[in-house]
Structure formats: C-alpha cells, structure tokens
Regions:
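Amphipathic alpha-helical segments within well-ordered protein domains
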Residues: 12, 46-49, 87
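Short, well-structured N-terminal submotif of metal-dependent ribonuclease cores
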Residues: 1-40, 52-64, 131
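Active-site-proximal, substrate-binding regions of enzyme catalytic domains
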Residues: 43, 47-78
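Conserved beta-strand segments of alpha/beta enzyme cores
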Residues: 37, 72-74, 139
C-alpha cells in the first residue's frame, strides 16, 4: 500500500455510488481503499464541492471522513510555494492548459514525493513531468 493524491475527477468517481450503495466505479473506489494515505489538496476539495452541486449530503460525508483522524484521508493545504510551482507547471506545459488545481496537484505530488495520482485526466497528468528537471512521470490510477 502506498499513498496517493486524489484529483477531482478521480475522487468524484471513487465516491460515486449506485442507489443500492455499490460503487459506480469500483476500480476508483478500490484505489482509495488500498492507499496507505489519500492526500486531498484543498483546491481539489473546493472543486469537488462545486461539481457535487446540490448533493450536500455527499459533501458533508466526504468532509467528515477527511477530518476524521481514523481514516487515511489527509487534507493538504496549498503552500505559497505550491501555488508558485503550479503556475510554473502551467507555463511549462502550456499546451495542456492545466490551470491552478491540476498544477497544485502536481506541485503537492512533487513536494510530498507521492507520485501516484487518482485521476480521470489521463491526457494532462500522463504528459506532465515533475521534478527539478521535469523528468519524473506520475503514476496514474486506477
């Protein structure tokens, strides 16, 4: 088991459930369950809130789980250096049009040395490279 960083789409899919309670995207849910730590950047949490829209109960449940010290979730606030690095990623990989949230996911991955990303955005995170020389690829889950 290794830690992962949850991107917006990956987290939304991992949490999606059918009316009977079973996972809509079981491979995403399994990646969350198998992780030693699920790092959720605060900007990702804000984006998840936006996409959940009127599903307030789902957001309340997610926040409660993130704040529960007995879960594997870790809320990761963006440091000033993360925001600056996110803008560097956005400029370096301009054709991807990463934006601040995806750039911050990459910056947190780089700072925390956690290279496993739970995401639906294979195009951007598959092309992105982190590290001082932009040499390190990310491992995309599931």
């Amino acid at each position: 088991m290794a830690a992962l960083i949850a991107d917006t789409g990956g987290l939304l899919r991992a949490l999606a459930a059918r009316p009977d309670g079973s996972a809509t995207w079981p491979e995403y849910a399994k990646a969350l369950m198998d992780a030693s730590a699920v790092i959720v950047p605060a900007l990702v949490l804000a984006e998840v809130d936006y996409f959940l829209g009127k599903n307030r109960s789902a957001m309340r449940k997610l926040v409660a789980e993130i704040l529960d010290p007995h879960t594997t979730y870790e809320l990761e606030h963006a440091l000033p250096g993360d925001l600056a690095r996110a803008l560097e990623f956005d400029a370096k990989f301009a054709k991807l049009e990463l934006g601040l949230v995806d750039g911050t996911v990459a910056a947190v991955a780089e700072r925390r040395s956690v290279h496993r990303i739970l995401t639906t955005d294979r195009r951007d995170f598959g092309a992105l490279r982190i590290g001082v020389r932009f040499h390190r690829a990310l491992t995309l889950l599931p």
